[in-house]
């Protein structure tokens, strides 16, 4: 360390030696770094603004020269247009993170330019562009381009297609600096799922203008009126499925009812009468006239006692009549069996018993009453 003299001149010399060291250490260090950082940050933006202004001026000059025949500046305008395109491609390679200026051309993708949701998709993406980014550490700032161009070409002059990645049918993949962790994957909504699939397999195929501005709070709502915002669970039976099942049940019921009607229309074939039945048929009117009893059971008991009181010769006459009755019945109904009538009676009695005990309606395939269909349980949706 240099020795300072105690005199006035030595003190002045010592002050001169120590002043530059103090200024370098405490005053100029932070200011120089701030100036360098500001210059480095403002350099790319200033270059991009100069490129855009030169492109607009050259395109206007080329369009004005091409509209007037015989002007020698038309060829120079075409060459200027080619040079402008080359500089634009170079600027896109130098600054891949910058968002292009024309919002109207970029938002209307080839799939959205024709269809029934053209205007609604444009408005939905307009909202997405101006929604503030989610607060979180480590995320890049999301640029918000202006909605209107500063310099519009005059009416009637064709606009130059300066940005090819919006007009190409195959969209460019997302930039490499945006990882999959930073991209939110909300649920698909009906108004956007038809145009951009937001599944994990197709996230890499989205244009970066769409993948940057997919915010969960906006995507959960519906941009198109009349469409539900939530997707129903597959376990819930839709009303259309119930409507499809109802005609099927009606067809089954009509088939069962038609079968029952056919069986009811068939005439019931009675079995041939035996000897005692023939005697009852002949003597019943006489017993009713003689007795004051009107009950059928009492009349049958009286006829039974009289039948057993008859002799063998008298009973043989009725047995012969019964044999002739059976022969005639066999000729009229050759394939008839007494089991057919007994089966019908059993079925009818079983149906009546079921209806009286349960009071419900029988199913076409069983003897149990139909129950009301239990509604499907509602499963809550989980937001990923």
UniProtKB/Swiss-Prot annotation:
InterPro entries: Catenin-bd_sf, CTNNB1-bd_N, HMG_box_dom, HMG_box_dom_sf, TCF/LEF. Residues 269-337 bind DNA. Predominantly expressed in T-cells. Also detected in proliferating intestinal epithelial cells and in the basal epithelial cells of mammary gland epithelium. The keyword Lyase does not apply. Residues 1-59 are annotated as: CTNNB1-binding. Its main location: nucleus. CDD domains: HMG-box_TCF7-like. The keyword Iron does not apply. It is found in: Nucleus. Residues 374-384 have a biased composition (Low complexity). Induction: By TCF7L2 and CTNNB1. Disulfide bonds: none annotated. GO terms for biological process: canonical Wnt signaling pathway; cellular response to interleukin-4; gamma-delta T cell differentiation; immune response; regulation of DNA-templated transcription; regulation of gamma-delta T cell differentiation; regulation of transcription by RNA polymerase II. Residues 35-50, 352-370 have a biased composition (Basic and acidic residues). It comes from the Eukaryota. Keywords: Activator, DNA-binding, Nucleus, Repressor, Transcription, Transcription regulation, Wnt signaling pathway. Residues 1-88, 133-183, 337-384 are annotated as: Disordered. Residues 1-16, 62-78 have a biased composition (Gly residues). GO terms for cellular component: beta-catenin-TCF complex; chromatin; nuclear body; nucleoplasm; nucleus. A motif (Nuclear localization signal) lies at residues 344-348. GO terms for molecular function: beta-catenin binding; DNA-binding transcription factor activity, RNA polymerase II-specific; DNA-binding transcription repressor activity; RNA polymerase II cis-regulatory region sequence-specific DNA binding; sequence-specific double-stranded DNA binding; transcription cis-regulatory region binding. Belongs to the TCF/LEF family. Binds the armadillo repeat of CTNNB1 and forms a stable complex. Interacts with TLE5, TLE1, TLE2, TLE3 and TLE4. Interacts with MLLT11. Long isoform interacts (via N-terminus) with SOX13; inhibits WNT-mediated transcriptional activity. Interacts with DAZAP2. Transcriptional activator involved in T-cell lymphocyte differentiation. Necessary for the survival of CD4(+) CD8(+) immature thymocytes. Isoforms lacking the N-terminal CTNNB1 binding domain cannot fulfill this role. Binds to the T-lymphocyte-specific enhancer element (5'-WWCAAAG-3') found in the promoter of the CD3E gene. Represses expression of the T-cell receptor gamma gene in alpha-beta T-cell lineages. Required for the development of natural killer receptor-positive lymphoid tissue inducer T-cells. TLE1, TLE2, TLE3 and TLE4 repress transactivation mediated by TCF7 and CTNNB1. This is Transcription factor 7.
């Amino acid at each position: 360390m240099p020795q300072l003299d105690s005199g006035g001149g030595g003190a002045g010399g010592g002050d001169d030696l120590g002043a530059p060291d103090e200024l370098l250490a405490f005053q100029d260090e932070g200011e120089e770094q701030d100036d360098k950082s500001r210059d480095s940050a403002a350099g790319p933006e200033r270059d991009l603004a100069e490129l855009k202004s030169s492109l607009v001026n050259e395109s206007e000059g080329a369009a004005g020269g091409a509209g007037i025949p015989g002007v020698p500046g038309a060829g120079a305008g075409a060459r200027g247009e080619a040079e402008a395109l080359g500089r634009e491609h170079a600027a896109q390679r130098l600054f891949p993170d910058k968002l292009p200026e024309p919002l109207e051309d970029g938002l209307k993708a080839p799939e959205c330019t024709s269809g029934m949701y053209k205007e609604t998709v444009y408005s939905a993406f307009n909202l997405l562009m101006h929604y503030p980014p989610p607060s979180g550490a480590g995320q890049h700032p999301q640029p918000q381009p202006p909605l209107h161009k500063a310099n519009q070409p005059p009416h009637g002059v064709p606009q130059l297609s300066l940005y090819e990645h919006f007009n190409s049918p195959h969209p460019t993949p997302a930039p490499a600096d945006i990882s999959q962790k930073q991209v939110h994957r909300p649920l698909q909504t009906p108004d956007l799922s038809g145009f951009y699939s937001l599944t994990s397999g197709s996230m890499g195929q989205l244009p970066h203008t769409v993948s940057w501005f997919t915010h969960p709070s906006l995507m959960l709502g519906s941009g198109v009126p009349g469409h539900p915002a939530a997707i129903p669970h597959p376990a819930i039976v839709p009303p259309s499925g119930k409507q499809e099942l109802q005609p099927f049940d009606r067809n089954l019921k009509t088939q069962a009812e038609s079968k029952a009607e056919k069986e009811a229309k068939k005439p019931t074939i009675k079995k041939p009468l035996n000897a005692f039945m023939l005697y009852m048929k002949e003597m019943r009117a006489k017993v009713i006239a003689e007795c004051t009893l009107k009950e059928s059971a009492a009349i049958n008991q009286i006829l039974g006692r009289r039948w057993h009181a008859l002799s063998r010769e008298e009973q043989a006459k009725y047995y012969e009549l019964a044999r002739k009755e059976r022969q005639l019945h066999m000729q009229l109904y050759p394939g008839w069996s007494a089991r057919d009538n007994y089966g019908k009676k059993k079925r009818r009695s079983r149906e009546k018993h079921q209806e009286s005990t349960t009071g419900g309606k029988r199913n076409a395939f069983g003897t149990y009453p139909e129950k009301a269909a239990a509604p499907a349980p509602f499963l809550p949706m989980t937001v990923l």
